[in-house]
């Protein structure tokens, strides 16, 4: 039930553990901060982390005549969330499903959730280019996907996988909105100086190679990590941080390509 959704953005990563879900949740919160109504769909069936990151674990989803009702983060209902994590009794419960069952669940998430009118739907995907991604692209053909944001870390081993992700996007006809380099440097929580602990500028170099925008470079900032488990936006808590600056830039980028 995506008829009421104006803009659909897919967040991808070639490798797991690069902070894609953190980027997805904080981007959703940043869009809400800018006055938009936002939906966040977590289709990482085997590693759903969005409920934890937003402090929504233990919340229930319900069925209505129109389908599943998403979980709202507050009474304003400006951020709606759907994740398989809400269907699991325990965060440690594994999802042991073969491909066809995963495909069926993702189709349900995309067609049977009662999203109200949304300015943006952010889809947080699992890493890689698997059945889940193909299913998403097939389901979005009718309504259209407005683009993908690819998250990477600066190490070469991660960049190799992102090159595959870029090829996947081109073959499936997804517009790449840009690349975000995450975990580039460590911000000292005391003096806030940033020190590179991995290689640097890998995301920018890859964006140049692929001829797509480089949306920004996010450091490892312990102050951002503390926000996990809440619906607090970096824009509110750390407005002068590099993370807030990059998120603001991405929001402005989305405004330029969005359907109003």
Swiss-Prot record:
| Disulfide bonds, paired cysteine numbers | none
**Cofactor(s) listed:** [4Fe-4S] cluster
Q: Name one GO molecular function term.
A: metal ion binding
Key words, A-Z:
4Fe-4S, ATP-binding, Cytoplasm, Iron, Iron-sulfur, Metal-binding, Nucleotide-binding
Write down any Gene Ontology CC term.
cytosol
The UniProt record gives the binding positions of [4Fe-4S] cluster as 188, 191
Protein name from the UniProt record? Cytosolic Fe-S cluster assembly factor Nubp2 homolog
Protein's organism: Drosophila erecta
């Amino acid at each position: 039930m995506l008829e009421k959704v104006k803009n659909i953005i897919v967040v991808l990563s070639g490798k797991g553990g690069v902070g894609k879900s953190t980027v997805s949740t904080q981007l959703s919160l940043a869009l809400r901060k800018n006055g938009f109504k936002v939906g966040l769909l977590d289709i990482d069936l085997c590693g759903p982390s969005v409920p934890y990151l937003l402090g929504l674990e233990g919340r229930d989803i319900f069925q209505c005549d129109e389908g599943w009702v998403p979980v709202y983060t507050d009474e304003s209902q400006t951020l709606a969330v759907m994740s398989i994590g809400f269907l699991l009794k325990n965060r440690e419960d594994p999802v042991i499903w073969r491909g066809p069952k995963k495909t069926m669940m993702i189709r349900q998430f995309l067609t049977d959730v009662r999203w109200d009118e949304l300015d943006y739907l952010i889809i947080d995907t699992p890493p890689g280019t698997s059945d889940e991604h193909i299913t998403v692209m097939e389901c979005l053909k009718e309504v259209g996907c407005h683009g993908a944001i690819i998250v990477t870390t600066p190490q070469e081993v991660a960049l190799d996988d992102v090159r595959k992700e870029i090829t996947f996007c081109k073959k499936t006809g997804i517009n790449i909105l840009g690349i975000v380099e995450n975990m580039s440097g460590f911000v000292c929580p005391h003096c806030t100086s940033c020190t590179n602990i991995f290689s640097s500028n890998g995301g920018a170099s890859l964006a140049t190679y692929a001829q797509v925008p480089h949306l920004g470079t996010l450091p490892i900032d312990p102050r951002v990590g503390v926000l996990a488990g809440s619906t607090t936006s970096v824009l509110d808590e750390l407005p002068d941080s590099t993370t807030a600056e990059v998120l603001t830039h991405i929001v402005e980028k989305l405004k330029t390509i969005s359907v109003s």
